C-alpha cells in the first residue's frame, strides 16, 4: 500500500502556513469550470459530490460566491442532494469522509503534490467515487512561492508536467477503477489538454 512521503508532510505544513493568508487558496480555480462541471454532473446523473482539495471553498459559500462571479453556490447550480468538502491544509475541512460519492471534483491540487506522492493521492481520489471524477490540473508554474520550510523559494506547483503525462498517469491508476469515468482538463502555458477516460463499449 502506498503511503505519504516525508515531502508530502513537509509540503502540507507549508500549505497550512500559506492558508493563513486570507487571499490564498480560496478554491476559485473551480469558477471558470462550473459550466463544464454542471454538464458532467447532468450527463452522469450525479447527486452527491466531494470536492477533494477545496481550499477555503468560496464557490460553495452562499455568502461569498457572488463576490467571485457565481449567481449561486456550486451545490445549488449543480442541483446536488449533498456535498462534502476536504482540504488537509485547511482546519475547517481537514477531515476526509470514508463515504463514496457520485462525483469527486479535484481542481488545482495535483500540481501541488510531490511526484512520489501522486500515485497514492490519485488512488485516494478515485477510491471515493462511485461514478465520476473531474480533474483540473495546471501544467505551468504558479505565481506563488513557498516562504519558509524545506521548499522555501520554490514554486508552489511542485509537479509541473505536460497534460499527456498526466493522462498517462491517471490511466495507469484508473486500470484498477474501470467502473469510473474520468474527465480531465490540463492547462499549460499555450495549450489545453482535455481527456475522458472510460471503459470502451463492446
Describe these PLM feature segments:
Residues 109-112:
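Hydrophobic adenine-recognition pocket in adenosine-nucleotide-binding enzymes
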Residues 114-118:
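Short N-terminal helix/helix-N-cap motif within the alpha/beta-hydrolase-1
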Residues 1-101, 119-122, 128, 139, ...:
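Conserved N-terminal segment of class I S-adenosyl-L-methionine
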Residues 105:
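A conserved beta-strand element that flanks and buttresses the S-adenosyl-L-methionine
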Residues 131-134:
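Short glycine-centered segments of the SAM/dcSAM-binding site in methyltransferase folds
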